[in-house]
């Protein structure tokens, strides 16, 4: 596929709460240190703006752009409904894809008008949750998708008498039926599959300081076609 510009698009997929925002935060830090210009995009940003406007017009005071953990869980079903219904009612189910595509194209146009090169510009899309979003990354921008899973260590009993203890990985389950259906479809199209242990950190900014998580992100980035060859230049922490 021949692109009209040299911008690199990387999408991050995985269940809600698997750490996609943390992944993007760490990736941004790594790429910036390696002299790349990073743009952060999310399909959910457009969704949240629409939901916020609807709530405001209906007299609600909830700010969906600044939610506590409890508020996120309470409002998540509304986000899922709003996002899915917009897809259902749009041509080809591309409502959110088209919004983010327009946003990215505007950024590129502004850069070109300003005489900026897009050669070392990386667009990180933090919430690729549907197959048509992954297809957009691949087909429209010749980009790649990284799929992320989160797990926790748990002791389990086993053996013949049930007295033996084993430390096992327990992966996060889907938070809702929609993600249980869509995430496996996205995962099979992902170019890089990675996983990490949940650290229980309060924010992405705090979690991004974890060296073990930084190494996971670094390895994933260097496994994409954009950085894995020495001739191109692998990334470093």
Range-by-range predicted roles:
Residues 16, 99, 133, 138-140, ...:
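Small-molecule kinase domains that catalyze NTP-dependent phosphoryl transfer to phosphate-bearing small molecules
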Residues 1-10:
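Extreme N-terminal, non-catalytic leader segments
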Residues 12, 125:
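Hydrophobic anchor at the beta1->P-loop junction of P-loop NTPases
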Residues 20:
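Conserved lysine of the Walker
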């Amino acid at each position: 596929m021949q692109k009209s510009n040299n911008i690199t698009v990387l999408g991050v997929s995985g269940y809600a709460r698997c750490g996609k925002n943390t992944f993007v935060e760490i990736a941004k830090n790594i790429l910036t240190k390696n002299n790349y210009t990073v743009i952060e995009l999310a399909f959910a940003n457009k969704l949240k703006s629409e939901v916020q406007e609807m709530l405001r017009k209906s007299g609600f005071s909830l700010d969906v752009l600044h939610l506590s953990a409890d508020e996120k869980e309470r409002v998540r079903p509304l986000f899922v409904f709003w996002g899915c219904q917009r897809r259902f009612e749009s041509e080809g189910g591309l409502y959110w894809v088209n919004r983010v595509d327009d946003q990215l194209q505007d950024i590129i146009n502004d850069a070109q008008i300003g005489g900026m090169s897009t050669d070392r510009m990386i667009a990180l899309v933090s919430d690729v949750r549907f197959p048509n979003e992954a297809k957009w990354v691949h087909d429209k921008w010749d980009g790649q998708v990284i799929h992320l899973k989160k797990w926790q260590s748990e002791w389990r009993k086993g053996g013949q008498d049930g007295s033996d203890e084993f430390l096992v990985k327990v992966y996060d389950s889907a938070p809702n039926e929609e993600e249980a259906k869509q995430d496996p479809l996205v995962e099979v199209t992902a170019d890089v599959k990675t996983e990490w242990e949940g650290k229980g950190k309060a924010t992405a900014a705090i979690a991004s300081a974890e060296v073990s998580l930084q190494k996971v992100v670094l390895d994933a980035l260097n496994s994409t076609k954009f950085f894995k060859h020495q001739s191109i230049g692998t990334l470093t922490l």
